[in-house]
């Protein structure tokens, strides 16, 4: 059994989701969102984000983490803020002793829904099928759960291929 922490980093609202994976079976453990105050200084927002993710790691003791690869936005300021938030989240994982697997957004969607072009509604609908009864905190938490599920699926496939 493996506990996986999925992460969808953002400065305004970072989603997180924890699943338990055993072979091809997955189970929902917990999920949530870390919101930061847009009016606060960026250093305070990043500190809050780091502390919150560190608390999630301490509470759920995952075996590994997974995050979406960064994408380049048309707005350089938005890309910079995303990179800063992502760095904070990855640093919290490293401080907690977690390896972080990174996956492209299209690969996450393909692994969970079956098509890399799936929209957020399709991902959320599939989460309801894969984890019936799970109360998902919001769109960012749903994305984080999808990242964790994709990581579990990709690891299962890799294990099947190895001799």
Swiss-Prot record:
Active-site residues, Swiss-Prot/TrEMBL: 8, 68, 140
MF (Gene Ontology): crossover junction DNA endonuclease activity; DNA binding; magnesium ion binding
A Gene Ontology term for the protein's cellular component: Holliday junction resolvase complex
PROSITE patterns in alphabetical order: RUVC (PS01321)
Class in the EC hierarchy, top level: hydrolase
Location, primary (coarse class): cytoplasm
Cofactors required: Mg(2+)
Keyword flag ATP-binding: no
Protein location: Cytoplasm
UniProt record, GO biological process: DNA recombination; DNA repair
List of residues binding Mg(2+) 1: 8, 140
Entry-linked SUPFAM superfamilies: Ribonuclease H-like
Keywords from the UniProt entry: Cytoplasm, DNA damage, DNA recombination, DNA repair, DNA-binding, Endonuclease, Hydrolase, Magnesium, Metal-binding, Nuclease
EC numbers: 3.1.21.10
Function: The RuvA-RuvB-RuvC complex processes Holliday junction (HJ) DNA during genetic recombination and DNA repair. Endonuclease that resolves HJ intermediates. Cleaves cruciform DNA by making single-stranded nicks across the HJ at symmetrical positions within the homologous arms, yielding a 5'-phosphate and a 3'-hydroxyl group; requires a central core of homology in the junction. The consensus cleavage sequence is 5'-(A/T)TT(C/G)-3'. Cleavage occurs on the 3'-side of the TT dinucleotide at the point of strand exchange.
Family note: Belongs to the RuvC family.
Subunit structure: Homodimer which binds Holliday junction (HJ) DNA. The HJ becomes 2-fold symmetrical on binding to RuvC with unstacked arms; it has a different conformation from HJ DNA in complex with RuvA. In the full resolvosome a probable DNA-RuvA(4)-RuvB(12)-RuvC(2) complex forms which resolves the HJ.
Official protein name in the record: Crossover junction endodeoxyribonuclease RuvC
Organism the protein comes from: Erythrobacter litoralis (strain HTCC2594)
Gene: ruvC
């Amino acid at each position: 059994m493996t506990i996986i922490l999925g992460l969808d980093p953002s400065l305004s609202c970072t989603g997180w989701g924890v699943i338990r994976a055993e072979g091809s079976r997955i189970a929902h453990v917990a999920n949530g969102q870390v919101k930061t105050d847009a009016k606060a200084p960026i250093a305070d927002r990043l500190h809050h984000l780091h502390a919150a993710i560190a608390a999630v790691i301490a509470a759920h003791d995952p075996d590994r983490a997974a995050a979406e690869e960064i994408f380049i936005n048309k707005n350089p300021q938005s890309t910079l803020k995303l990179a800063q938030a992502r760095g904070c989240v990855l640093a919290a994982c490293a401080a907690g002793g977690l390896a972080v697997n990174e996956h492209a957004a299209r690969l996450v969607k393909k692994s969970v829904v079956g098509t890399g072009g799936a929209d957020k509604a399709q991902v959320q609908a599939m989460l309801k099928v894969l984890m019936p009864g799970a109360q998902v905190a919001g769109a960012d938490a749903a994305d984080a759960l999808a990242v964790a599920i994709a990581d579990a699926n990709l690891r299962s496939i890799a294990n099947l291929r190895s001799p």
